């Protein structure tokens, strides 16, 4: 692998969580760290994240808190399966999921992602994030069903 990391994008869906197990296996096999990525899409509503708010500022704060808690939980769960000395770096980006994943994938050795994620408006607008990543990434991509 080109660098010391496996990129694992997540949208917190069951399929994405299943893909995390494969990312841990790859990291252990190649003795590399994991970069866990979540992209907050502008097309996703507070309802998708299960957050009720009164103002845009409150929405931003609640979403950030929700995403941070989910990422920390996934990081702790994944760390249990990693060999000693390997680490997980959590990254949250804002924007189009395909674009942000591809930007993050520019300097990793491999991407491990789910074949499909959560359903909602974002998927209706751009349903094939995994296809975009497979087609455009410069590194190997493992797509997990």
Where are these regions (language model features)?
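Structural beta-alpha unit
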Residues: 1, 76-111
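Intrinsically disordered or low-complexity boundary/linker segments at protein termini
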Residues: 1-18, 81-85, 89, 135-145
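Small/aliphatic-rich secondary-structure junction motif
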Residues: 2-54, 104
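Histidine-centered beta-alpha loop that forms part of the nucleotide-sugar donor binding/catalytic region
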Residues: 11, 95, 115-118
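Active-site phosphate/pyrophosphate- and oxyanion-stabilizing loops and adjacent acidic/basic residues
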Residues: 24, 76, 131
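Conserved beta-strand termini and adjacent loop/short-helix elements that scaffold enzyme active sites
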Residues: 37-39, 91-95, 144
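A short acidic, glycine-rich active-site loop
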Residues: 54-70
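Gly/Ser-rich helix-loop-strand patches that form or flank binding pockets
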Residues: 104-145
């Amino acid at each position: 692998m080109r660098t010391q990391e496996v990129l694992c994008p997540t949208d917190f869906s069951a399929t994405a969580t299943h893909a995390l197990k494969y990312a841990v296996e790859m990291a252990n096999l190649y003795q590399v760290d994991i970069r866990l990525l979540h992209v907050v899409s502008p097309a996703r509503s507070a309802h998708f994240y299960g957050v009720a708010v009164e103002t845009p500022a409150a929405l931003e704060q609640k979403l950030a808190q929700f995403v941070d808690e989910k990422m920390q939980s996934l990081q702790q769960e994944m760390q249990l399966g990693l060999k000693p000395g390997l680490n997980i770096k959590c990254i949250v980006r804002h924007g189009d999921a395909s674009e942000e994943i591809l930007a993050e994938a520019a300097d990793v050795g491999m991407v491990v992602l789910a074949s499909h994620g959560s359903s909602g408006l974002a998927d209706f607008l751009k349903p094939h994030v995994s296809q975009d990543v497979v087609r455009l990434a410069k590194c190997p991509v493992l797509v997990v069903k």
